[in-house]
């Protein structure tokens, strides 16, 4: 094929080969770990649906019936839903129980959680990544489910980057213009009340973040430490990735940006991470679905590397880089 013919996909294949020390990257078996948690900020009316939806979707994930589960099945990817902070006392079949607490506080009034709780959630994420490595998975992605988490991710992004709330707050699952304005005000209020320290990602997450963001942050730290390539999902995933990179810059070498979400913070987060997404499809579903779409494209991109003959084998002069 022509040099650079697969564009960004070729860049990712080269990155994967470097991470794995394999001439042809191996991206099977692969796993998606989905962190499910509730956010007290829903009390501010920043979402279209109620908090109970988190528990419903978490239960469906355990039964293999969510959007992400359907997409993952089509690309032969294992899905591990994790209850890291769903509100209420539940025991979901098929869901890993790593609950730290039953939802967070309302960040427009108080810190989301204590520092110790944030650290515990990060540690749970690290442990889950280590479990993936021990089970032999060669590629991982992280996802989330939690009503209100585009509000917390906007607050965390603003705190880590210094960007104004108006630049990083989006419509989430579907807010009106009036609802979006209210959401921006809530993000601004949460930052003013909690005063997160921008140079301390744990402080930021504990004050204005969520348990899903904390768990994902740990998951990315753990996966990188285990040498696993990580396919990022959307805005919440990238928010956690930035927190992980701020804690350990080497994590960035293991991150692959699948897509740029419709949420306004996504482009800024990818820029901060130094990543270029290879899908721009206006997606904003979450759960890891954007990562799943990216992995499907990587399967396609790897096929010629595995199966095509070389230029020597077909008697054609190879392309040469032109200066």
Named regions from a protein language model:
Residues 1-323:
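N-terminal loops that bind phosphate or other acidic moieties
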